[in-house]
Amino acid sequence: MIRFAPALAAAATCALATPAFAQQTDVSDPLPTGEEATVFDGDFLSVGVGVGYNPSYSGSDDYNVNVLPIVQGSVWGVDINPRPAGLALDLIPDAAEGVSFSAGPMVRLRNDRVDAEDINDDVVAAYGELDRAVEVGGSVGVKFPQVLNPFDSLSFTLDATWDVAGAHDGRTISPSVTYFTPVSRATAASLSFSTSFVDDDFADYYYSVPATNAALPAEDVLPGFDAEGGMQSYGFNLLLAHDLSGDLTDGGLSLVGIAGWTKLVDDAADSPFTSIRGDNDQYLVALGVGYTF
């Protein structure tokens, strides 16, 4: 299993993410301490709450504030890792030392434009609400420890999901790479780079625009657009986590700050929902607090 600590940090990244910020971050022990016991040695659970400021839909230049619960942990040898509005399970035991692997099932909800009241653009809202997608698939990863110092790691993760709820009926593939390092005994940081690729069904559902719309005056109707699959986005997330007890390894209360930028590309950027009514530069700022035990 691949672990990241404090666990709240990864949970906050994913729980506060919009569809454009489908960032993967897995759990990782913060500081190898030899024989010294840590809260992450056996079963543990992290719970908390986060507040995020993020786009009102994928491609929007209007932003909403969201308050979301956070949960992550390891139970009976199975890591529970957050995904945006979902979870991924890691079923592979950690290697005693050296390279570690992760693999397991995942499920997530996609809530993009499902509620017109959350779309802060009257023109986009006039094109109607979308159905909530339920995406099921799997996640695999590999972690290389001690890259630049004895306590850091470099992780590669790949998520693939398919909608099973009859919303977009499509597929997403999301590779990411994360560098994690403790800054001190109390503070850790990670920098992640991620990309996302979607198929034609996904792109058509979220980014195509019909040529007519009777709900809008003629001057507000957007030009018709037929979106096709391909690369949807790439971006970076920077995360800082600070344990309030001064020791990342003993659990307790932690504070987490996240800043992220995502660039929509290809048809996700060319869609009038983005190019006319929104912006292909998407930003995320989030703060979280939680308790690990």
Name each region found by the language model.
Residues 51-54, 119-124, 158-160, 216-225, ...:
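Extracytoplasmic loops and strand-loop junctions of Gram-negative outer membrane beta-barrel proteins
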Residues 43, 63-69, 99, 130-136, ...:
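Residues that define the transmembrane beta-barrel architecture of outer-membrane proteins
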Residues 47-55, 78-89, 123-125, 153-164:
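Transmembrane beta-strand segments that form the barrel wall of outer-membrane beta-barrel proteins
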Residues 43-49, 69, 80, 101-105, ...:
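Transmembrane beta-strands of outer-membrane beta-barrel proteins
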Residues 49-53, 69-75, 87-93, 105, ...:
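Residues on the lipid-exposed face of transmembrane beta-strands in outer-membrane beta-barrel proteins
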Residues 142-146, 164-174, 178-254, 261-269, ...:
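Outer-membrane beta-barrel transmembrane domain signature
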Residues 32-43, 59, 78-101, 145-153, ...:
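Short loop/turn motifs that connect adjacent beta-strands in outer-membrane beta-barrel proteins
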Residues 1-40, 60:
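Cleavable N-terminal export/targeting peptides
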